[in-house]
Design a protein with these regions (language model features):
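N-terminal chloroplast transit peptides
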Residues: 1-27
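Acidic, low-complexity terminal tails and accessory targeting/binding regions
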Residues: 18, 28-62, 75-80, 149-188, ...
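Active-site-proximal alpha-helix that buttresses catalytic centers in soluble enzyme cores
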Residues: 44-160, 209-212
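Short, well-ordered beta-to-alpha junction loops that form the rim of enzyme active sites
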Residues: 68, 130-134, 173, 218, ...
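Short, active-site-adjacent cap segments at secondary-structure transitions
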Residues: 71, 135-137, 176-177, 244-246
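Generic structural signal for individual residues within well-ordered alpha-helical segments
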Residues: 98, 191, 212-215, 246
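Short glycine/proline- and acidic residue-enriched helix-loop micro-motifs
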Residues: 192-213
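A short, acidic, amphipathic alpha-helical segment used as a generic capping/interface helix at domain edges
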Residues: 218-230
Length: 294
């Protein structure tokens, strides 16, 4: 059966336009009835009324690594519950493990590019920070294994003089964006949120964590991590989730509307340099629902 995603997504985008209009918002409010309430055991999400200040210059190099394919990706469901932090639920599939390991050469390529730049002086130290969700932590661990996978990669690391910290440092600030009443539902329900994000980065429809709230915690997390490596010039890998990393890359780059983040989607196991200018962003793609398994 052909997926209805490409057909329904434009409809939801049109509906999103109505969501921000007082004359049509009542129609979307009725959609809420189809979803269960927020789990009372889940912590409440901060309501943020505005986007944070621009991210100031940082002392270290940053790289963004999305987790490999997870069992939740294969099930085709949204997995964002805070109770997943520290658990083994929704970890990597065999393909996800492979994607995590295969991210290592690309990461080394980015680090090598930064070593050749005239900007921040490098310490050649590499650190991995990760969301506490299993799929992210396991991806960081697999990337580390990938850096030791064969003689060719090991030789590159030695020639570059990299000193890789083998410990994966967990940080709650890198957790998945919380999707409130949509948590555990099918991927297509992203269509109730992403289009509205483009109009209003502060919205909390369905009790989701807003783009502004994610940007605010990412800003705090980056500044905190940067302060822990005050000497500067370190190479820091942030292993996290699609929405969080997409928001991070456009916020860090200084794009005018961070709510457009979903048009710069990360693939499973994809690593990117965290650029600080808009011209470092990849080409934007039309808003589409994610496919099952991604």
């Amino acid at each position: 059966m052909k997926s209805l995603g490409p057909v329904l997504f434009p409809i939801f985008i049109a509906a999103a336009s109505g969501f921000v209009s007082s004359s049509t918002s009542c129609a979307l409010k009725n959609v809420h009835k189809h979803f269960a309430g927020v789990n009372p055991q889940e912590p409440s999400v901060a309501v943020v009324d505005e986007m944070p200040d621009a991210l100031p210059p940082l002392k270290n190099h940053y790289y963004l690594l999305r987790h490999g394919q997870s069992t939740a990706n294969v099930e085709g469901i949204i997995s964002s519950a805070r109770s997943l932090a520290g658990s083994t639920k929704h970890g990597l599939t065999l393909l996800g493990i492979e994607q995590g390991r295969n991210s290592a050469p690309s990461l080394i390529d980015f680090i090598e590019q930064d070593l050749s730049d005239d900007g921040i002086t490098s310490t050649k130290k590499v650190y991995f920070y990760s969301s506490p969700f299993a799929r992210a932590k396991e991806t960081a661990e697999q990337c580390l294994k990938g850096m030791r996978a064969n003689d060719e990669i090991a030789k590159r690391i030695e020639e570059l003089g990299l000193k890789v910290n083998e410990e994966v440092l967990l940080d709650d600030g890198l957790m998945e964006r919380y999707f409130g009443r949509l948590d555990g539902t099918e991927l297509l329900t992203y269509a109730y949120v992403w289009p509205v994000d483009t109009f209003d980065p502060t919205h909390v429809a369905f009790d989701v964590e807003s783009v502004a709230a994610v940007s605010t915690r990412i800003r705090s997390t980056l500044l905190d991590i940067d302060s822990k490596h005050e000497e500067g010039g370190n190479h820091i890998v942030l292993t996290s989730h699609a929405d969080v990393l997409q928001i991070t890359q456009v916020y860090a780059a200084g794009i005018a509307n961070v709510g457009m983040f979903s048009q710069y989607r990360f693939g499973n196991g994809e690593v990117r340099k965290m650029g600080r200018t808009v011209d470092t962003l990849p080409e934007a793609v039309p808003l589409q629902p994610p496919e099952r398994g991604t």
